[in-house]
């Protein structure tokens, strides 16, 4: 359905293009089918698509009642998650948006509380131009009424919340744009903005964060890579590439890249040699810079099997990931686990670079359920059809890497020990949204 | 190794002006002129993988300090320059020249594929001074920036090409890049037997692959050599046959480095030759040798394999899930034997690029009716999850108990030993004692074999098996489009349809990797699995722990 409507190949860019014109429900269907068919695959593409879709959903949702907004986002989120349960980034973004709405609702309640005491009421500001001018008033009325009702029933609860739980996240993450700035703006602008505008702004900030996350991570590169180091990495993760490129601007080191054969070797080869041939969705929306080799960095491409042989000479292993779980474990490209294991055996530090958006509040109990299996013909091409009939060919796409194999996480917030991740999780997602 | 590269631009920037005056005396003053080659040779040696981009800069960098020290020596120490010092200097010059010649010779040999480099650099050994001095002067002079700008074209194309070729050896493995593998029989000595000539090419193309197979094939070829051998007048068979064989051996080792088993077999054969009484008539001696070869193959390989397969098959129980890596002949025999014995078990084969040896094993086992699962290296952790035993073949067992086998074996053994939260999976190695060696290895770097990196370029799995022996086709990008299509039909060849253009890009990103600076491909053949990952080595002499390898090796060689 999405591909027939558009001449473009289905993917992130075509989805974003169609998002503006298509009605909401079509867009949701569109993304659901894209996710189902794995036409959107990279975590960041999924995250971006989800964020843009939710932006549309929230802006089209003609209510300022936070509960209704939450319900709407939840229902959309559930559909997206059901479409691709292993793509945890989608759930992460939905949860963050839900958290945003809840935050705003709470702030609003507090504000109402404070304002009614003060008795002052100013015209609500709507900085983002929404289609109709009559809306703000209605919404305000509605909000007032509902909040009033709310307040009468449970003001002590709200105040307890603000006493105990609320101030903490504010203080503990000063540098996340997504969660910090709305509050700051709120306090500076007064408490009169309507929930929806705030939420939209928050979503926009999430989208901004998604765009900048690799560069923010790369900013830590010089803290971790020193001269003449030998670094091993795996797959063609853009986060890792940017990280290394940043360090390459200042320092000379050697990079060994394992090609991650059946699933990502083409992209890896292209990244390594600098001639990007396939216009991957991954590469289309970030201006891909010069390859590492152009910076005078020696790049050695090896087959995955040679990792153990070379590990004794490697100083550091830097890995990208698909998503990070709350216990510090990883779901990363297949083959990552043996690399991390080999690094552990050789006492080589393993550094995982990942945006916070990949950090999922899910605790893995059933590891196998996290693993996705891919196209078996990549392992055994159809030329060997006689063989394919007789044997069971497996092509796992992801590996679960336990937390004890990782020494350090570098996110856009800085470096963390794997054991600290639960804390970041609790900063970013609200408890009530973890299983929505 | 990167430091000089860093400093080069700054040094050259500063020294451009001051470097000019000393460059004139350089041409007339022998010592300074000879200083140049020293520096040159040293820089060239230090940076095997130096990029040709930086080469002019480095050349410029080099003369500047040389000139500095020279002028310092001229100012401070010219008058009291003793004969001893002069002698020392002369000696250093000579050494430097020699080193340079050697490098150039090596470079020429390494770049056998590129005829231009050989042509450009063939002469220098004869007149190194003449060749270098003008070059050095040119680099120092105002021409230098010009050269740098046009670093890709430039007049020194031959030099650059040579540098580029050298570039491609990974620094850590510098010691493993010998001469390039022989590609044709051309240039082989006339004393090399036809059977050996053919075997050499088969070895090179992995037609004969696997430690045991290579050993057997070598011995059979040598048997034919012995059969067709006639002792020349004036020598005796035990004396001359050894040298005659060593020609064959040299040829074989240029095709592919000899395996441990081949080495052991050859050693045994040479011992057998030496044991022959010189007074024995030639035909009798040849018969003895042929019998020796036959019995060696029978005892050390054929029967040994049967014994190992039988005892290893007993280790397999009903319901087992056996994981194995790549395609070992002895493991195949073991599994088939166990299947023959009526055991019910499943086999999970892990395979790797670029050889895909496991595919043949999978085919053989599937044809025999076994339950086979197949995945690549990236699926190790999944395959090992429900494994109950790991069976591995060996290329060799080193004296410190390490298993030296196809690259990737160590990963499998490691995964078996470190399964998170589970019971350790026993790792069983099947290995004939002819593969035991008294060498020791701590890692996979000191002793290893590096295969042609072009094998990695083609991403297409199907081509890897069939079209391997043609690395030349992969290096030349224009041939590529036709290549994948070749097998299908002629109809698709004339029209470069969208399908072909879509499929072609997959090998292309790396097609020109040899011309891409700083990019290196590494295609290792083996890795060393630590002894602690191996629980048991099954040999024809019994099942041993890996620590027993040196003892068995001593026993079997003393026999």
Write out the residue ranges for each language-model feature:
Chain A
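Predominant activation on well-ordered alpha-helical scaffold segments within soluble catalytic domains
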Residues: 29, 48-55, 74-77, 91-98, ...
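Long amphipathic alpha-helical segments
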Residues: 2-150, 154
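Conserved phosphate- and dinucleotide-binding cores of soluble alpha/beta proteins
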Residues: 128, 133, 138-186, 242, ...
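Small/polar-residue-rich loop-to-helix segments that shape phosphate-bearing ligand pockets
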Residues: 182-200
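A short, well-structured juxtamembrane/interface segment
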Residues: 209-226
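Glycine-rich phosphate-binding "P-loop"
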Residues: 194-213
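Gly/Ser/Thr-rich loops at beta-strand to alpha-helix junctions
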Residues: 230-241
């Amino acid at each position: 359905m999405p591909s027939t409507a558009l001449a473009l190949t289905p993917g992130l860019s075509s989805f974003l293009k169609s998002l503006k014109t298509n009605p909401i429900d079509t867009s949701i269907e569109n993304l659901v089918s894209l996710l189902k068919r794995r036409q959107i695959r990279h975590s960041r593409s999924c995250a971006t698509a989800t964020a843009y879709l939710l932006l549309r959903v929230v802006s089209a949702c003609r209510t300022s009642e936070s509960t209704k907004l939450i319900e709407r986002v939840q229902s959309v989120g559930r559909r997206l998650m059901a479409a691709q349960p292993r793509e945890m980034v989608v759930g992460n973004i939905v949860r963050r948006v839900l958290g945003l709405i809840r935050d705003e609702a709470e702030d609003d309640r507090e504000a109402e509380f404070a304002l009614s005491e003060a008795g002052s009421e100013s015209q609500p500001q709507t900085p983002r131009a929404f289609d109709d001018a009559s809306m703000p008033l209605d919404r305000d009325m509605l909000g007032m009424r509902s909040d009033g009702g709310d307040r009468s029933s449970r003001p002590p609860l709200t105040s307890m919340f603000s006493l105990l739980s609320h101030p903490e996240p504010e203080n503990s993450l000063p540098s996340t744009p997504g969660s910090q700035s709305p509050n700051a703006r709120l306090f500076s602008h007064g408490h009169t903005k309507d929930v929806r505008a705030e939420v939209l702004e928050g979503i926009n900030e999430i989208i901004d964060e998604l765009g900048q996350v690799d560069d923010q991570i790369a900013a830590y590169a010089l803290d971790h890579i020193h001269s003449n180091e030998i670094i091993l990495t795996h797959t063609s993760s853009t986060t890792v590439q940017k990280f290394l490129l940043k360090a390459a601007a200042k320092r000379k080191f050697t990079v060994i890249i394992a090609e991650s054969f059946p699933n990502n070797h083409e992209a890896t080869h292209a990244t390594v040699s600098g001639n990007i041939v396939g216009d991957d969705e991954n590469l289309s929306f970030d201006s891909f810079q010069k390859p590492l080799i152009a910076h005078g960095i020696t790049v050695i491409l090896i087959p995955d099997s040679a990792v153990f042989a070379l590990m004794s000479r490697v100083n550091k292993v830097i890995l990208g990931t698909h998503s990070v779980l709350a216990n510090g474990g990883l779901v990363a490209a297949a083959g990552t686990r043996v690399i991390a294991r080999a690094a552990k055996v050789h006492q080589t530090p393993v550094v995982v670079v990942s945006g916070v958006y990949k950090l999922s509040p899910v605790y893995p109990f059933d590891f196998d359920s996290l693993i996705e299996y891919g196209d078996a013909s990549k392992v055994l091409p159809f030329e060997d059809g006689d063989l394919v009939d007789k044997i069971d060919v497996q092509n796992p796409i992801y590996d679960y890497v336990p937390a004890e194999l990782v020494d350090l996480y570098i996110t856009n917030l800085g470096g963390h020990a794997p054991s600290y991740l639960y804390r970041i999780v609790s900063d970013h997602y609200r408890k009530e949204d973890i299983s929505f | 190794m990167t430091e000089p590269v860093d400093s080069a631009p700054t040094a050259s920037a500063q020294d451009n002006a001051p470097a000019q005056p000393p460059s004139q005396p350089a041409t007339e003053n022998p010592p300074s002129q000879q200083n140049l080659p020293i520096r040159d040779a040293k820089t060239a040696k230090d940076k095997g993988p130096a990029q040709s981009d930086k080469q002019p800069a480095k050349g410029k960098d080099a003369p500047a300090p040389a000139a500095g020290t020279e002028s310092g020596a001229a100012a401070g120490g010219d008058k009291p320059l003793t004969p001893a010092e002069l002698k020392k200097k002369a000696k250093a010059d000579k050494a430097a020249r020699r080193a340079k010649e050697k490098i150039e010779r090596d470079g020429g040999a390494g770049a056998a594929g590129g005829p231009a480099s050989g042509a450009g650099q063939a002469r220098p050994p004869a007149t190194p001074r003449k060749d270098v001095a003008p070059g050095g002067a040119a680099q120092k002079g105002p021409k230098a920036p010009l050269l740098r700008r046009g670093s890709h074209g430039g007049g020194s194309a031959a030099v650059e090409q040579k540098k580029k070729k050298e570039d491609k050896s990974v620094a850590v493995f510098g010691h493993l890049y010998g001469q390039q593998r022989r590609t044709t029989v051309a240039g082989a000595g006339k004393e090399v037997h036809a059977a050996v000539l053919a075997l050499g090419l088969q070895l090179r193309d992995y037609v004969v692959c696997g430690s045991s197979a290579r050993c057997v094939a070598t011995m059979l070829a040598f048997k034919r050599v012995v059969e067709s051998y006639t002792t020349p007048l004036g020598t005796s068979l035990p004396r001359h046959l050894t040298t005659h064989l060593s020609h064959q051996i040299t040829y074989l080792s240029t095709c592919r480095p000899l395996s441990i088993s081949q080495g052991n077999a050859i050693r045994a054969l040479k011992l057998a030759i030496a044991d022959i009484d010189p007074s024995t008539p030639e035909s009798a001696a040849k018969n003895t040798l042929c019998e020796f070869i036959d019995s060696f193959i029978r005892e050390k390989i054929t029967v040994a394999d049967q014994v190992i397969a039988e005892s290893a098959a007993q280790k397999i129980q009903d319901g087992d899930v056996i994981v194995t890596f790549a395609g070992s002949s002895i493991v195949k025999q073991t599994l088939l034997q166990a299947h023959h014995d009526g055991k019910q078990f499943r086999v999970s084969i892990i395979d790797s690029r670029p050889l895909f040896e496991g595919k043949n094993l999978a085919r053989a086992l599937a044809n025999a009716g076994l339950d086979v699962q197949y995945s690549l290296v990236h699926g190790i952790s999944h395959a090992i999850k429900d494994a109950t035993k790991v069976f591995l073949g060996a290329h060799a067992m080193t004296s410190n108990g390490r298993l030296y086998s196809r690259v990737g074996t160590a990963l499998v053994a490691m995964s078996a030993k470190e399964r998170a939260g589970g019971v350790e999976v026993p790792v069983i190695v099947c290995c004939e004692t002819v593969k035991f060696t008294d060498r020791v290895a701590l890692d996979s770097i000191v002793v290893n074999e590096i295969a042609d990196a072009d094998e990695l370029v083609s991403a297409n799995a199907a081509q890897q098996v069939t079209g391997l022996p043609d690395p030349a086709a992969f290096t030349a990008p224009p041939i590529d489009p036709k290549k994948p299509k070749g097998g299908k039909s002629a109809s698709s060849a004339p029209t470069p349809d969208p399908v072909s253009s879509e499929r072609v890009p997959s090998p292309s990103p790396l097609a020109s990797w040899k011309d891409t600076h700083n990019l290196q491909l590494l295609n290792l053949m083996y890795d060393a699995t630590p002894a602690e990952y191996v629980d048991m080595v099954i040999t024809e002499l019994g099942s041993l722990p890996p620590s027993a390898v040196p003892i068995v090796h001593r026993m079997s060689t003393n026999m």
